[in-house]
Structures are given as C-alpha cells and as structure tokens.
Amino acid sequence: MGACASGGCPVAEFLLGIPAWGWWAGAAGLFALWLAGQAWKREAFWSSLFYWTARAVCLAWFRLKYRMRVTGAENIPRKGGVVLCANHASYLDPPVLGCAAPHRLVRFMARRSLAKNKWLGILYHQLKAIMLDRDRGDLGALKAAIKRLKEGDAVGIFPEGTRSPDGTIQEAKGGIAFLLAKAAVPVVPMYIEGTFRAFPKGAKKFAPSRIAVTVGKPIPPEEILSAMPQKGDYAAAGALVMRRIAQLAPKDKP
C-alpha cells in the first residue's frame, strides 16, 4: 500500500504499460470464453428439453398402447452417479428404461454402428448418448461413461450388449462388466417384461403386449467389488448384476 500511495505501485505501472492491442486481445478472449459458456448452456438446455419431451411422448404411448406400469421406481436415487442396468430383448427397451426413471435424465450407452442411420445418429446426438464400439474393446467409451457417473449423471446400460434372440437373459459382456466394477457408484437392477412380445429382434411391426418394469434395490459398489474372487475378475461383477436382474423377473420366466 505504501508503494502505491507514493506513486510507485507496480500493479498500476503494469496495467498502464499494457498496449491498446493487449487490452483488445484480452477483452476478445474473455468474450470468446463467455460465448463458449453460453453455447454450452444452450446445448445442455436443448438436450435436456429434447430428452424430457421425448420421454413424455414415449411414456404416453407406452401407457396407452401397452398399459406400461413400473414397480419400485423409488429405488432409483434422485441424485448422484448411478448405473441403471436392465435386460435387453427389444429396441423398445431404452425408451422404456428412461420412462421408468421419473426423476433422472438418463444418458445411454449405445452401439456406435447404430448411429450410421441418419435419424438414429441425430437422436443419439441430441440425447448425448455414449457411443460404444462393441466389436473392439472401446476403453474410451467406458472411460467417458465413468466420467459421466463421477459427475453425478445416471447412465443406462444393457449389460448383455445386444438384444436377446429369444427373450431370455444372457451373460454380461466383458466391457460392461469392467464399467460396473470401475464406476464406484450404485447399480440399480431393472427387469423389463413385455417388450420382447411387443417388438422382438427381427420384427417389422409392433405386436400386442403389456409392458412392466420392476426396479430392484441399488447394489452398493462395495458389494460389486466383493463379488470378484480376485482383482480384475470383471465377469464375476457382471454375473452378480445379471443375477439381480433375473431375480426381478416373474416366477414363470427363465
């Protein structure tokens, strides 16, 4: 303070010594950062608006056409990173899973090859889906999903990796099992009933059915880790989650 009072303030001398172009460059940089922040906010806003609008439309359709009902939705945490895991037997499963989570915006993992379709590509972009190359160990996509989870997002996955050919539950894929073990967040098992009858693999049109979703209790990350007999046994973690999903199925289901 004494130096500034006597007229020799180094900060003031530094600021006064900046040429005019320096001030313009600094102002332009700050303006660019502000624009980038606004663009990010707009993109996040429109993505959220698209998700909730699409969810409302899908939910209305599922309830009217398939009398969809959900049991145990209260088991889905309202905030914080969480993985929503369900069985997979139909292309209807992703929107059904999203409709079964009333308070969460769900980011899905999807097969990258599906985005080759123009309209699906636009849809996945709007939904901010995490695109996964299923045929190659896509570590980048798995890390992106883990990052989303650590940021507090809800990520929806189908551990089987593909639609069941006969509606029965299949084994979890290795990459997804790796994600379940590494995410360190609760995993909520969900069983979807009725979508296989409504629109099975290879179907060209929708068939009559009733859709029901049963949501189980969250599996703590500690339990998933303890399920592995040795470090790196991700298959055991995947098997635990698939067992919990199967336990939610009606008694007459395999």
Language-model-derived ranges and their functions:
Residues 2-66:
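N-terminal membrane-anchoring alpha-helices
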Residues 57-59, 126-132, 159-162:
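Short, basic, glycine/proline-bearing loop/turn elements
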Residues 45-52, 63-64, 77-136:
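Catalytic core of membrane glycerolipid acyltransferases/transacylases, capturing the structured
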Residues 3-32, 140-254:
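Non-catalytic C-terminal accessory region of glycerolipid acyltransferases
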Residues 67-69, 136-142:
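Glycine-rich, highly charged phosphate/nucleotide-binding loops
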Residues 68-70, 129, 187, 213:
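Generic structural signal for residues in well-ordered beta-strands
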